[in-house]
Structures are given as structure tokens and as C-alpha cells.
């Protein structure tokens, strides 16, 4: 398929993946899922100060950004689902302890022992949910929280810190999801023709046509020339920008030769 024609990374975390997909992942990560025309342009311009992107890569940016945004939503969704499992576990223990505290307070210590033996997680989602359910209910229900506090202290943490961390995680997830959904909408309305032409190094060189004819062409005609450039670049050792420079140099030489005659 088309993606196999794109340059791929030879090493690193994204080895074997199209280079432009790695760029998309970096772009999404850098802005926590938020995209806008200016930030995207700045990112691509900065990248091209090191490595020039091909026309094919520039045209692939929108689909790669969509994939990166969907991956970001998947990652956040997986984390939320994992946290939900911990919260459900906390709810289950809270239900049992609240019921025992009301019906058989003397057996509460046995419930706490059962929870301790089960080695519950000390994740912020578990701790925050258990604290939310048990705090302020009755003096007896302070016992399981005391055990949790002692368990957390082994890692240098407190219940309050874990509650605060959970609130921050949930807020960050909400922002990331909102940004990603907003960015998917942005991708649908972005003028990608204008973007590719403004970002392409080869395009900028072709517009230096000494006759000024290339810049005056309509988009379809310019695209025809660019496709020819891509085909030639795939068949020789020169890159698109180098071929464009060579074409302009030949055009200038021919124009100068014609003027001299």
C-alpha cells in the first residue's frame, strides 16, 4: 500500500514505522492532543530544519495525525478503564465494610484483615474511591483508612496525596479527550492543499521558476509537476528538493542561453 512507500525509521522506539507517523505521535504528545494550524506548522518547520519531508509524507500527515489522535484516545480510554476496575474494587470493599459496621461492628476488624490479605492496590483511583466512601461515616470506618494510610506510608505517600493525584489524573484525562476530539474536527476542516504547498521544500524551490509560470499555474497543474518530481525521486539517488533545484538550475541556464542568443 501507499504507506510502504513512506520513509521508515530504522531504530528507536518507533523502528519500522513510517517516519511521519512518529512525527504525528510527537505532535499529539507535545500538545496533549491539541492541534491548531499554527502549532502544527511550527512543528513541521522545526522538524524540517533537520530532515526534509517528502511530498508523500506531507500528504500523509492528516491521516497519520488521525491515527495518532485515535491512539491517544485509546491510551486514555485504557487508563480510565483500568482505573474503573480499581474504583469498583474499592466500592466493593466499602460496601462490605459499611454493611458490617452497621450490622456487626465487632466483625469489622475481620473485614479489614480480609482486605489486607487480598493485597489491594494502592493506586490513586482505589485509595481516592475508598476514602470518598468511608471518610466521615463513623469512627469504626476510620480503621480501614488507618490501615491504608500505614500501607501508603511505606511508599512515602498519604491518602490526601493520592486523592489529589486522582483528581489531577481525571482532570488531565478530560482535557486530553476534549483536545483529541476537537483536533479530529480540526483535521476535517483544515485546508491540506494549502498546508502541503506551504510546507514542501521542493514546492518552494519550484516556485523559483525563472519564467514565473509555475507559481501562476492552478493547483492541479502544479500537482502534476510534483507527481513527476516524486516519480523521478523514487528512481534515482537524488531527493525531491535536489531534483527541484536541478530543474530550476536548468531552466535558468536555458533562459540565460536564450537571452544570449
Walk through the language-model features, giving the residues of each.
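Short amphipathic alpha-helical segments and their helix-coil junctions
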Residues: 2-8, 43-52, 204-211
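ATP-dependent phospho-/nucleotidyl transfer catalytic cores
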Residues: 1-17, 41-42, 59, 67, ...
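Active-site activation/catalytic loop segments of kinase-like enzymes and analogous catalytic loops
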Residues: 16-58, 65-82
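Basic, amphipathic N-terminal segments
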Residues: 1, 91-261
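Extended charged low-complexity segments that act as oligomerization/scaffolding linkers
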Residues: 72-79, 83-84, 95-106
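A generic short alpha-helical patch detector that favors 3-5-residue windows
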Residues: 12-19, 35, 39, 122, ...
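Short acidic/histidine-centered micro-motifs embedded in hydrophobic/aromatic stretches
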Residues: 64, 76, 246-250
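A ubiquitous short alpha-helical element
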Residues: 8-11, 27-33, 62, 115, ...
